[in-house]
UniProtKB/Swiss-Prot annotation:
Contains one proline-rich sequence (Pro-Glu-Ser-Pro-Arg) that is required for transport activity. It is found in: Cell membrane; Apical cell membrane; Basolateral cell membrane; Mitochondrion membrane. Glycans are attached at N72, N99, N114, N199, N317. It catalyses: (R)-noradrenaline(out) = (R)-noradrenaline(in); (R)-adrenaline(out) = (R)-adrenaline(in); serotonin(out) = serotonin(in); dopamine(out) = dopamine(in). This is Solute carrier family 22 member 3. Highly expressed in placenta. Highly expressed in kidney cortex. In kidney, expressed specifically in the proximal and distal convoluted tubules and within Bowman capsule. Expressed in brain, particularly in dopaminergic neurons of the substantia nigra compacta, non-aminergic neurons of the ventral tegmental area, substantia nigra reticulata, locus coeruleus, hippocampus and cortex. In brain, also detected in astrocytes in the substantia nigra reticulata, several hypothalamic nuclei and nigrostriatal region. Expressed in neurons and glial cells of amygdala. Belongs to the major facilitator (TC 2.A.1) superfamily. Organic cation transporter (TC 2.A.1.19) family. Keywords: Cell membrane, Glycoprotein, Ion transport, Membrane, Mitochondrion, Nucleus, Transmembrane, Transmembrane helix, Transport. Mediates the uptake of clinically used drugs including neurotoxin 1-methyl-4-phenylpyridinium (MPP(+)) and platinum-based drug oxaliplatin. Plays a role in the anticancer activity of oxaliplatin and may contribute to antitumor specificity. It comes from Mus musculus. The lineage of its organism: Eukaryota, Metazoa, Chordata, Craniata, Vertebrata. Electrogenic voltage-dependent transporter that mediates the transport of a variety of organic cations such as endogenous bioactive amines, cationic drugs and xenobiotics. Cation cellular uptake or release is driven by the electrochemical potential, i.e. membrane potential and concentration gradient. Functions as a Na(+)- and Cl(-)-independent, bidirectional uniporter.
Length: 551
C-alpha cells in the first residue's frame, strides 16, 4: 500500500496547484506583519503634548493662541534634544496661584515674580500637536499613563500566546482549514471593534482577541503550506513565506504615512483578513492531516484534484494510502516531552523561539531610540531582512538546517556583544555591526519556523509548532520591559543580554537532528528513529576516523 509521500510525488510535489495555494496563503504573512508591528504607528508619540489648567483654557480662547504659543506660555521649558520624538510635559504652570484679581494678560507669566510660576502635575485636559492621530492622543497614554502603551503590545503578544495553545490544538484536532478560516474572520471582526473602541478597556480586550486569532491564522497557514508540498520544496516555501512577512514590514510605513488616523491604520491592518474567507473555495484541507484522522478517502479526492491541476494522473494503485498511525489520538502537551528525542527537541526549540523574539524585537525597538524619520527608518529596517531570506535559501540545502541555524544565532550574539563595547566615536562601525546582528537574528527567526515544522510528527505538528512558538510570544511580552529597564541602568546592557542569549542558542541548536532532505515524520516513533539514526551515523564516522589514524 503506497504512502502519502509516494502519492504526493505521483500527483506532483510542487506543481501548479501547490504554487497557487502557496501564493494565496503567503498573503497571510503580509497581514500578520501588519498586526505584529502595527503598534509602532498606532502608538506613535505626538510631536508635542501638554495639559491645560482652567485659566490656560480661558486665556487660549481669549487670546486666540496658536498651539505653539500655548505650549510656550503655559508649560515650562523642556530641555531635550530637538530631534527626539514625543517631546511633552507632565507638569504645567499653576496660573491659578497668582494673587491678582484682574484677568491675566496674554503673557500670563508677567503676573509672577521673575516670571516664575509654581508647577503642578498634569491631571487631564491634554493637548497634542501631531501629524497623524494615534492611540496615545486618543486615550491620553502619556506621563503617568505611558505604561498603558506598553500594555497594548504586551496584551497582543499575550493573545498570540493564547492563540498558540488554543487554536494550535484545535487545528490538530478539527482541521487546518476550518481553524484558518475562523481565525481570519476573527482577525477582521476584532480589528474593526478595536478601530472603533469607545474606551481603552474595550481597545485592550479586543486587541487581545485579535492577537489570538492572528496567531491562529499565521501558524495554521504555515503548516498547511509545509504539509501540501514535497520534502524538497519545504525549504523554499518555509523561507519564502517569511519573506512575505518582511514584505508586510516594508509596506506598512507607506500605509501609515498616507493614512491620517490610527483608526484608518487599524482598519487597513484588519479588513484584508475578510478576503481570506474566499480561500474556502480554493485552498483544500491538508490531505496529510486527513490521513492521520482516518479520512483517507477525502485525502485521495484532494490528491486527485492536485494531480489533475498539475497535469498528472493517480493510477488505481493509489486507491488507498497508508495510515501510519494504528491509533489516532488527540494531541497532548505530554506527547512533546514523553520520549527523549521529542523532549530534547521541544526544550531546545522553545529556547530558540524565546531568544529569537527577545533579540529581534529588542534590536528593532532599540533602533527606534536613536530618533530620525520613523517611516524611513522602519522601511530600511525591513529591507535589511531581505538578504537574510536569500542567504537561507542559498545555504540550508547545501549545508543543512543546523549549521546556518547555529551560525546565524552566533553572528547575532557576537555582533550584539561587540556593538556594546564599541566607542561612540565610530558610529559607522557601530551601525555596520548592529546591522549584521539584525541580519543574523532575522535568519535565526526564519529558520526556527522551518526546523520546528520539520521535526514534529503530523499528529503533533500544528500543536507542537504553536506551543513552541508560544515562547516567542512570551519573549515578545517581556522584550520591551527588558530593553527599557536595563537601558535605564546602562544603555548597552540590553545588548550584552541579547548577545549572551543568542550565543548560547547557537550552541544548543547543534544538538538538534538534521532534517535536510528527509520525509516529514508521521509519528513520534519516526522522530525518535531520526535522532538515534543520526547519532549512530556520527558514532560510526568517529570510529572510522580513529581506525584510519591508527593505520
Amino acid at each position: 500500500m503506497p504512502t502519502f509521500d509516494q502519492a504526493l510525488r505521483k500527483a506532483g510535489e510542487f506543481g501548479r496547484f501547490q504554487r497557487r495555494v502557496f501564493l494565496l496563503l503567503c498573503l497571510t504573512g503580509v497581514t500578520f506583519a501588519f498586526l505584529f508591528v502595527g503598534v509602532v504607528f498606532l502608538g506613535s508619540q505626538p510631536d508635542y503634548y501638554w495639559c491645560r489648567g482652567p485659566r490656560a483654557t480661558a486665556l487660549a480662547e481669549r487670546c486666540a493662541w496658536s498651539p505653539e504659543e500655548e505650549w510656550n506660555l503655559t508649560t515650562p521649558e523642556l530641555h531635550v534634544p530637538a530631534e527626539r520624538r514625543g517631546q511633552g510635559h507632565c507638569h504645567r504652570y499653576l496660573l491659578e496661584a497668582t494673587n491678582t484679581s484682574s484677568e491675566l494678560s496674554c503673557d500670563p507669566l508677567t503676573a509672577f515674580p521673575n516670571r516664575s510660576a509654581p508647577l503642578v502635575s498634569c491631571s487631564g485636559d491634554w493637548r497634542y500637536v501631531e501629524t497623524h492621530s494615534t492611540i496615545v492622543s486618543q486615550f491620553d497614554l502619556v506621563c503617568s499613563n505611558a505604561w498603558m502603551l506598553d500594555l497594548t503590545q504586551a496584551i497582543l503578544n499575550l493573545g498570540f500566546l493564547a492563540g498558540a495553545f488554543t487554536l494550535g490544538y484545535a487545528a490538530d484536532r478539527y482541521g487546518r482549514l476550518i481553524i484558518y478560516l475562523i481565525s481570519c474572520f476573527g482577525v477582521g471582526i476584532t480589528g474593526v471593534v478595536v478601530a472603533f473602541a469607545p474606551n481603552f478597556s474595550v481597545f485592550v480586550i479586543f486587541r487581545f482577541l485579535q492577537g489570538v486569532f492572528g496567531k491562529g491564522a499565521w501558524m495554521t497557514c504555515f503548516v498547511i503550506v509545509t504539509e501540501i508540498v514535497g520534502s524538497k520544496q519545504r525549504r523554499i516555501v518555509g523561507i519564502v513565506i517569511q519573506m512575505f512577512f518582511t514584505l508586510g514590514i516594508i509596506i506598512l510605513p507607506g500605509i501609515a504615512y498616507f493614512t491620517p488616523s490610527w483608526q484608518g491604520i487599524q482598519l487597513a491592518i484588519s479588513l484584508p483578513s475578510f478576503l481570506f474567507l474566499l480561500y474556502y473555495w480554493v485552498v483544500p484541507e491538508s490531505p496529510r492531516w486527513l490521513i492521520t484522522r482516518k479520512q483517507g478517502e477525502k485525502a485521495l479526492q484532494i490528491l486527485r484534484r492536485v494531480a489533475k491541476c498539475n497535469g498528472k494522473h493517480l493510477s488505481s494503485n493509489y486507491s488507498e494510502i497508508t495510515v501510519t498511525d494504528e491509533e489516532v489520538s488527540n494531541p497532548s502537551c505530554l506527547d512533546l516531552v514523553r520520549t527523549p528525542q521529542m523532549r530534547k527537541c521541544t526544550l531546545i526549540l522553545m529556547f530558540a523561539w524565546f531568544t529569537s523574539a527577545v533579540v529581534y524585537q529588542g534590536l528593532v525597538m532599540r533602533l527606534g531610540l536613536i530618533g530620525g524619520n520613523l517611516y524611513i527608518d522602519f522601511f530600511i529596517s525591513g529591507l535589511v531582512e531581505l538578504p537574510g531570506a536569500l542567504l537561507i535559501l542559498l545555504t540550508i540545502e547545501r549545508l543543512g538546517r543546523r549549521l546556518p541555524f547555529a551560525a546565524s544565532n552566533i553572528v547575532a550574539g557576537v555582533s550584539c556583544l561587540v556593538t556594546a563595547f564599541l566607542p561612540e566615536g565610530i558610529p559607522w562601525l557601530r551601525t555596520t555591526v548592529a546591522t549584521l546582528g539584525r541580519l543574523g537574528i532575522t535568519m535565526a527567526f526564519e529558520i526556527v519556523y522551518l526546523v520546528n515544522s520539520e521535526l514534529y510528527p503530523t499528529t503533533l505538528r500544528n500543536f507542537g509548532v504553536s506551543l513552541c512558538s508560544g515562547l516567542c510570544d512570551f519573549g515578545g511580552i517581556i522584550a520591551p520591559f527588558l530593553l527599557f529597564r536595563l537601558a535605564a541602568i546602562w544603555l548597552e546592557l540590553p545588548l550584552i543580554i541579547f548577545g549572551i542569549l543568542a550565543s548560547v542558542c547557537g550552541g544548543l541548536v547543534m544538538l538538534l537532528p538534521e532534517t535536510k532532505g528527509i520525509a516529514l515524520p508521521e509519528t513520534v516513533e519516526d522522530v525518535e528513529k531520526l535522532g538515534s539514526s543520526q547519532l549512530h551515523q556520527c558514532g560510526r564516522k568517529k570510529k572510522t576516523q580513529v581506525s584510519t589514524s591508527d593505520v
